């Protein structure tokens, strides 16, 4: 979740994002970066720079390498550079420069993927990175891109050349034609892969529908309705076995859907009437909760099977528990920016 150009909360938070398995989340700050354990919440790393903001932080599971991009009022690094930080040495060990601003970075153990506003470049994850591939995208100011972290699956997904399309390439065999999915009519706002790389979830800027596709065939598996009013989708994430997804939006809500068993999702009692519009047959979330502050947030499933974590732009952390009926209760609340590593 990129909070540039301005975070209204004035807490210095520029960016927050989960690592590949959601076990940690990282924050880019006006004066450095921080890393937290997601559940239970615990500050793991706090790197402060005397002068310099970090607008993007990408972790590689829990290893010592992080990708940093400078940003904020006084960027620590030029915004057109990717810096690979070694947290054991407490310094940058790799630097890659581009002619335009870096929008996002994705890592896997063997690759560095850099997202620019209309192309994606793939490099070897070596001391002297070697460029392997370049993929053109439509205009992509949000830096949308997902990289499967699974060692047996090298899928990379990103907005295609056509509006609303998702393109999926296999980095292990790029000679294979990419899978092109016409996911939405409008501009994409969010994409997410499950951990195994077998499913991709998508949302458009309209934000009313979430669609789930099979990554190998491109076939639509499920269409889920977040709501009837347009919304800005901040985050979509699958749980570990891809049976559930959680979705956060600017309506201050986090919705939970069944991704594999559609019978769990709510449906209108009028759904069986064939003459009614498609809206009434929609699959709605079986559970949802309101983030009390209404602040922009990212969400992911916790370590317990029926728990969801929300990380908010105002520095608040929420853990909610839900039951099979969809009833939701708040379990934990904390201010993660104010804690120190010995508090929890």
Swiss-Prot record:
GO term, biological process aspect, one: autophagosome assembly
| Subcellular localization | Preautophagosomal structure; Lysosome
Membrane-spanning segments: none
Write out the residue ranges of the motif L/FRRG motif. 224-227
Q: Where are the WD repeats?
A: 183-223, 228-267
Query: What would be an example GO MF term here?
Result: phosphatidylinositol-3,5-bisphosphate binding
Q: Name one GO cellular component term.
A: phagophore assembly site
Q: Which Pfam families match?
A: PROPPIN
Report the family membership.
Belongs to the WD repeat PROPPIN family.
Note what the entry says on domains.
The L/FRRG motif is required for recruitment to PtdIns3P.
Q: What is this protein called?
A: WD repeat domain phosphoinositide-interacting protein 3
Species name? Xenopus laevis (African clawed frog)
